[in-house]
Amino acid sequence: MLTLLKGPNARTSECVRTALNASTRGMDAARAARGGMEPGRANPTAGLSPDKQEIADLVRALAPQYGVEPGLALALIRVESNFDPYALSPMNAQGLMQLIPGTARRFNVRNAFDPADNIRGGLAYLRWLLAYYQGRVVLAAAAYNAGEGAVDRHGGVPPYRETQEYVGKIARFFGAEQHLYDGRLVDPSPAFPRRGGGAL
């Protein structure tokens, strides 16, 4: 049960907080030793140049502030932009996390080509998607690529080749099917049944 909790909060009893801190400390140390990566998965930061490694370090520092596993954020950036802060898609998706202008505005990104600003906006959006899909990584990744409307309409990963390949690439780097999420952020998608556990 404790592994389903993201962390202690005001409603968490002292004995649960103590146990949670002890159990997650070891888990976090093990994950940190692997660079935030899942064992047996491709490393999205393998072979990065020193300047791109600085971006990866920034992601590792910022992701926990948004309740996002660094490994998932790094996988997204590897697939979205290959760590190019100036990436620009034909659909006008911009920067490291390939934010379209509407999403950038929605998550208060002033300059999508500024690495820190882009990462913060992308993490905020990813955090929202994880809450909306109750921690289901595949659905959150599919929605990051195709939009939550498309995922809801199709009741899962849309039958778009690009999105299906995208989800496969994310899974190659980040294998977890479920991610912790903040259930207070947004009501879950009406297209998927409510699940217990995984939320604060």
Where are the model-predicted features located?
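Cell-wall glycan-active module
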Residues: 1-78, 172-200
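Solvent-exposed, acidic/flexible segments
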Residues: 45-56, 65-66, 70, 88-97, ...
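Short polybasic/polar patches that bind polyanions
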Residues: 60, 64, 105, 131
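Short, solvent-exposed positions on alpha-helices
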Residues: 71-74, 138-142
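Solvent-exposed coil/turn segments that connect beta secondary-structure elements
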Residues: 79-82, 102, 147, 175
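A short, acidic/glycine-rich surface segment
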Residues: 84-87, 154
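Substrate-binding/active-site groove segments that recognize
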Residues: 86-110, 121-130, 142, 148-149, ...
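Catalytic and substrate-binding regions of cell-wall glycan-acting enzymes that process beta-1,4-linked
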Residues: 140-186
